């Protein structure tokens, strides 16, 4: 593995950490309705647990209401039960073959919990990025030790990896700050 390969791999993995953070933050509840909020819910479908999106159509009715329309009418009760039993604190209402999921307004305490959860997700991503930096630096040190690269190359690579790390951590901070602002908006 060359220094260029190490940098390319590290950049790619750091980008994956950012994408994972975006997905995790999308699941953190804000005051507004968002169909991705229900992505983590699984429904019993003929004996196997499948994601809600595979048994129903999930859309927004308005800013505070999600509509869930199961493709099979027989699934309505199971879908409603799965949403109610999730840890999201939602109370779905069935209207025949359509299930309405109103978003209750969040209390100040719940907003603070969600903000803390968003910060924890951000911190986990920062740790992942820093671990990738450490792994890259160790790989370069091994190349120098094996005499496949010079110490000057090592210093340049470590500086480049540090710049990548700083850039990704700044992006993580921005994502978390935007999510916190979204959560705390009344």
UniProtKB/Swiss-Prot annotation:
Keywords for this protein: Cytoplasm, Protein biosynthesis
InterPro entries: Ribosome_recyc_fac, Ribosome_recyc_fac_dom, RRF_sf
Localization: Cytoplasm
Pfam families: RRF
Annotated Gene Ontology cellular component terms: cytosol
GO MF annotation: an example: ribosomal large subunit binding
Annotated GO biological process: cytoplasmic translational termination
Similarity comment text for this entry: Belongs to the RRF family.
Role noted for this protein: Responsible for the release of ribosomes from messenger RNA at the termination of protein biosynthesis. May increase the efficiency of translation by recycling ribosomes from one round of translation to another.
Descriptive protein name: Ribosome-recycling factor
Protein source organism: Delftia acidovorans (strain DSM 14801 / SPH-1)
């Amino acid at each position: 593995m060359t220094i260029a390969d190490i940098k390319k791999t590290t950049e790619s993995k750091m980008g994956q950490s950012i994408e994972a953070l975006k997905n995790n933050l999308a699941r953190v509840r804000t005051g507004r309705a968002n169909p991705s909020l229900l992505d983590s819910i699984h429904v019993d479908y003929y004996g196997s647990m499948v994601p809600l999106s595979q048994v129903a159509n999930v859309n927004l009715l308005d800013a505070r209401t999600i509509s869930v329309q199961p493709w099979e009418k027989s699934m309505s009760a199971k879908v409603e039960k799965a949403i109610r039993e999730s840890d999201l604190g939602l109370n779905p209402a069935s209207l025949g073959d359509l299930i309405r999921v109103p978003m209750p307004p969040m209390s100040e305490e719940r907003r603070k919990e969600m903000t803390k959860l968003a910060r924890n997700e951000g911190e986990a991503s920062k740790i992942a990025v820093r671990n990738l930096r450490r792994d890259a630096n160790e790989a370069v040190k091994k190349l120098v030790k094996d005499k496949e690269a010079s110490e000057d190359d090592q210093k340049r690579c470590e500086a480049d990896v540090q710049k990548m790390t700083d850039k990704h951590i700044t992006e993580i901070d921005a994502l978390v700050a935007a999510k916190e602002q979204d959560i705390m908006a009344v």
